[in-house]
Amino acid sequence: MTVALGRVQERGWFDVLDDWLKRDRFVFIGWSGLLLFPCAFLSIGGWFTGTTFVTSWYTHGLASSYLEGCNFLTAAVSTPADSMGHSLLLLWGPEARGDFTRWCQLGGMWNFVTLHGAFGLIGFMLRQFEIARLVNVRPYNAVAFSGPIAVFVSVFLMYPLGQSSWFFAPSWGVASIFRFLLFVQGFHNLTLNPFHMMGVAGILGGALLCAIHGATVENTLFEDTKDANTFSGFSPTQSEETYSMVTANRFWSQIFGIAFSNKRWLHFFMLFVPVTGLWASAIGLVGIALNMRAYDFVSQEIRAAEDPEFETFYTKNILLNEGLRAWMAPQDQIHENFVFPEEVLPRGNAL
């Protein structure tokens, strides 16, 4: 009698780690989790620490922490001082030299929150790729999430990289984000930028599509239950449809004359509109980072300057932008010691 003994292939440390990372647990870790969880934890933790304890006195001349009397809407982790340029502001770098207090005073917490936040978002997108591959579905969730990542990178990284320093990026707070919106309007006339227009159309269009789709599905649910609550009429394992696409198609055909007849095309369109808008707005931010102008109607400005009776909404907005610049620059960039003569400053409602 012959006995055949098969050799058991030895498993290396990589295989053991791979099995552990992909083990079925309540919160999936995966290889992407090695990037996502530490970066997300450090970014969120840095933001809570910064808004609670860290002042912006040395970078912006402002109070920005709960410790100084700010509330949730006015607290922020502010950008580094303009003099820091585009330094990474590492804790052990030449600016702080390992001094944590000094590092916070220079604005290093903003770099910490922003860079870890960027890698955390990338880790979240990779997580969607990884799980999609493991459960054998398409990776369109990850593709869709590239839109928010593009906006994050363009606003918090690309824009200040195109300017003189990190100082001109948005600080991490509610009121500070509003200040940034006013700043980019006054200095870049962003609302007249076609890429910003596409971004607005994409986001609001996506919200409209979402509302219409949800309402239409609710309108055309099959009566699978006698309960007042229609949710109980659905089972996640049921094979049949839960609403009538035919009825929905007929409804919108009567409303508009046209309607989606293909569920796959309908849902792709709902994906395409907001993601394209996000990417377009990201491209627009890269453009203004390089101080590119869009839609300067110089002929109207010249005519308005020559003819006091000629004015358009465009020329009015240009004057408003000049007012924003004149008022914001001395307040926002106090280190520049801007002094404007009285005759160029806006006066009341006259501008």
From Swiss-Prot:
It is a multi-pass membrane protein. Its EC number is 1.10.3.9. The D1/D2 heterodimer binds P680, chlorophylls that are the primary electron donor of PSII, and subsequent electron acceptors. It shares a non-heme iron and each subunit binds pheophytin, quinone, additional chlorophylls, carotenoids and lipids. There is also a Cl(-1) ion associated with D1 and D2, which is required for oxygen evolution. The PSII complex binds additional chlorophylls, carotenoids and specific lipids. The chain crosses the membrane at residues 39-59, 123-139, 151-164, 206-226, 277-293. Chlorophyll a ChlzD2 binds at H116. Pheophytin a binds at Q128, N141. One of its GO terms (biological process) is photosynthetic electron transport in photosystem II. The keyword Plastid does not apply. Chlorophyll a PD2 binds at H196. It is an enzyme of class 1 (oxidoreductase). Belongs to the reaction center PufL/M/PsbA/D family. This is Photosystem II D2 protein 2.
